[in-house]
Amino acid sequence: MFLKDFSFELPEDLIAVKPVFPRDSSKLLILKSLNSYQNCLFSDICDYLLPGDLLVVNNTRVNASKIIGLKKTTKSKIEFTFISNEKNGIWLCFALPGKKVSIGNLFVFKDVEGKVINKDKEKIYIDFGTKNNEFTSILKSFGEITLPPYISKLRKFEDQDNEDYQTIYAQKRG
């Protein structure tokens, strides 16, 4: 199997850039066998579940972890996606454009400053030190959900995306 096996043309007008409402009116593809499938709605799912079947649901909340940082020396805007608070205020993140980020750079996120202490290929580590709690609050208040590239090229982030990109079972931060 090759990556090119998954490449195909998908017209933009077939890409859903917003979820359907109500949510259970979304499409559901039922695969009956290798050569037999049926299109239906998610609200019909109970018609296809049998006793003993296992239905797995995702109860993880999508983190709003994308935020713009200003490079302290040049004031250039860099888009950061924060993945995890590794330890003692040191965060693992990715940046676009990553090539403009170097070890030792200082970035300001709203009014909290962080220093790049390590960079390994795409991974970047920023130390917020004693300002970690303040940064965490800023990320919760101003962070955005990262939209998939096929959507972000068609439209900008909207506040409603913070709810629309959560499953109805979302409880735990993930």
Which functions belong to the PLM regions below?
Residues 1-174:
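A cross-family signal for N-terminal binding/gating loops and helix N-caps
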